[in-house]
Amino acid sequence: MLPAQEAAKLYHTNYVRNSRAIGVLWAIFTICFAIINVVCFIQPYWIGDGVDTPQAGYFGLFHYCIGNGFSRELTCRGSFTDFSTLPSGAFKAASFFIGLSMMLIIACIVCFTLFFFCNTATVYKICAWMQLTFAACLVLGCMIFPDGWDSDEAKRMCGEKTDKYTLGACSVRWAYILAIIGILDALILSFLAVVLGNRQDSLMAEELKAENKVLLSQYSLE
């Protein structure tokens, strides 16, 4: 085999190995991110009490707990299965979009099984669109959630100065921050999926070209 052909074969082998390694990392990060998204959706620590709040407590997307001022016990309400218990329409909308994003990222993980049956590049691109839609749902959920801060229950915990997009004496908690960071993560994952899909397309084109060269050389020898 000529040195140029050996170098080309070595480059092709490394190219395939690197693409597979990056693909495995992308899949692992997607699974980890799905777990984080489920935690953000379930945990009620999006906003919480502070030093100067009238009542102790915390709010999530669909579950919240507020003290009664006379004891340390918190009264908890809210359920995703019963939207009527949510104190604001904004909380209902935010719960819907964050819940939809959770379902999309889980569906993306289920799509990993398509790698065994379908074209790899196509699966990457399907997952990329799903992750991009997932990021859009996260953006909507995170933007709509503060619109419900003017609800009576939120004001009871955070004070009368609380209003839409004004948190009053309360503070933002870790689940809300994690959801905002998740938007950037989802965009990075979708971009990486597009890159991997395009690399698979170019890889298939190179393999097809190599096969054609082999067939032509065999035909010429005959």
Swiss-Prot record:
Lineage top rank: taxon: Eukaryota
Principal subcellular localisation of the protein: membrane
Coiled coil regions, renumbered to chain: none
Membrane topology: Multi-pass membrane protein
Regions crossing the membrane: 22-42, 96-116, 126-146, 177-197
Distribution of this protein across tissues and organs: Brain-specific.
This protein's GO CC annotations: membrane
InterPro entries in UniProt: LHFPL (IPR019372)
Record's subcellular location: Membrane
Keyword annotations from UniProtKB, A to Z: Membrane, Transmembrane, Transmembrane helix
Pfam families with a match to the protein in the record: L_HMGIC_fpl
Record's keyword annotation contains ATP-binding: no
PANTHER family: LHFPL TETRASPAN SUBFAMILY MEMBER 3 PROTEIN (PTHR12489:SF13), LIPOMA HMGIC FUSION PARTNER-LIKE PROTEIN (PTHR12489)
Family affiliation: Belongs to the LHFP family.
Protein name: LHFPL tetraspan subfamily member 3 protein
Organism field: Mus musculus
Lineage of producing organism: Eukaryota, Metazoa, Chordata, Craniata, Vertebrata
